[in-house]
Structure formats: C-alpha cells, structure tokens
Regions:
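P-loop NTPase nucleotide-binding core
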Residues: 41-44, 48-155, 160-163, 169
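Well-ordered alpha-helical segments embedded in enzymatic catalytic cores
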Residues: 21-25, 137-141, 175
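A short, basic N-terminal segment
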Residues: 1-36, 41
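Substrate-engagement module of ASCE P-loop NTPases
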Residues: 143-146, 175-180
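A generic membrane alpha-helix/interface feature
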Residues: 37, 86, 176-177
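Substrate-gripping "pore-loop 1 plus following alpha2 helix"
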Residues: 168-176
Length: 180
C-alpha cells in the first residue's frame, strides 16, 4: 500500500487534511487585516496552511502576496523579490506591471526582465541608492497600491527566520517594524 501523505513540501488540494480550526482562524485574521505570526516546529504545515487560506481569500478586492524569504540571500534580494511579487500579484497584465512599477517605484529606476512566459515569469531590479528612501518606498508599496486601486493586500512572509543571515539583521528588522 502506498503512503497517501506527502512529506517535506507544501501540499494542496486533497493532500491538505485536517487543520479546519487553524484555517478558519487564519482566514478570519487575514480577512480582517490582523497581523498574524505562525510559530511551530519545522515541517508542521505552516506554509501549506498559509497557501490554502490565501488562495481562498484572494479575490478582486483582496490580493495576496506570498514571499519565501528562504530564497533571499541578502536584504537587497529581499527588497527585489518583495517588489516583484507585490507588483505581479496586484496587476494582471504586462503593461499594467510596468505602469504600476513606474508609478509606485519611480524614485528607484525599476528594470524588468521577462522569462519565456512573460505573463507569469518576470523579475524586477532597480538602481540601489542608499541615500534615498528606496527601502521605505518598497516596503510601503502594498499600502500605496492598495490605496490607489481601492483594494486590500495581504503579504505573507514565509521562512522569516532567514533574515538572521542578512548582513545587518537587527537594522533590517527595525526598518520593517518602523514602516509596517
């Protein structure tokens, strides 16, 4: 008999079992704009739970952004991925992505790179100027887009402990707390 369970990666659909109470509570928190932190040992299904709930609440009026911080090797890379994902999830077409980046990231000279599937595969880079408000502008991006478009945005940061490996993790965390 084959094992019906999947281990070691996020699951969805029929592989996601139980956790109804957790999902219900997280759904309520995210729908009502309540900052929520999930803490448990590794491999207990936090990522699967967040992805399930954010897929359920994602709509025309409430957009969800999922960022795997584990893939970020530096503070700069976090900002780049953060900006890319926020723009991607809050805009539906290439020209809208570009327009959104131009409007909301105008002070940092955004540059787009498109992959083989330009509708889904693109990344954003920018000129980094430590003397301006680049970090602040990027971290405020969801709030500014939400206000302009009349929507709400939920941002999920998975594997947040990865910031401990950034150059100056305490300063980075202080920036996040100050702006968010």
């Amino acid at each position: 008999m084959n094992n019906p369970f999947i281990f070691g990666k996020a699951v969805e659909g029929s592989y996601f079992t139980d956790r109804q109470e957790d999902a219900k509570r997280l759904h309520a928190n995210l729908s009502h704009g309540i900052n929520t932190i999930l803490i448990s040992p590794r491999r207990w299904g936090k990522t699967s739970l967040v992805k399930k709930v954010t897929a359920e609440i994602d709509s025309k009026d409430l957009k969800t952004v999922f960022i795997d911080v584990f893939s970020c090797k530096s503070e700069y890379e976090f900002y780049r991925i953060f900006a890319t994902e926020v723009v991607k999830q809050t805009s539906s077409k290439i020209d809208e992505w570009i327009e959104t980046a131009k409007i909301f990231l105008s002070n940092i000279s955004p540059k787009f790179s498109f992959g083989s599937d330009p509708m889904n595969d693109f990344s954003l880079s920018f000129e980094w100027n430590e003397h301006d408000d680049t970090e602040k502008e990027i971290l405020q991006l969801p709030e500014k887009i939400a206000e302009k478009k009349g929507i709400r945005i939920v941002v999920s940061l998975d594997e947040f402990q990865q910031v401990a490996f950034f150059g100056d993790q305490l300063t980075f965390q202080k920036k996040l707390r100050t702006i968010w």
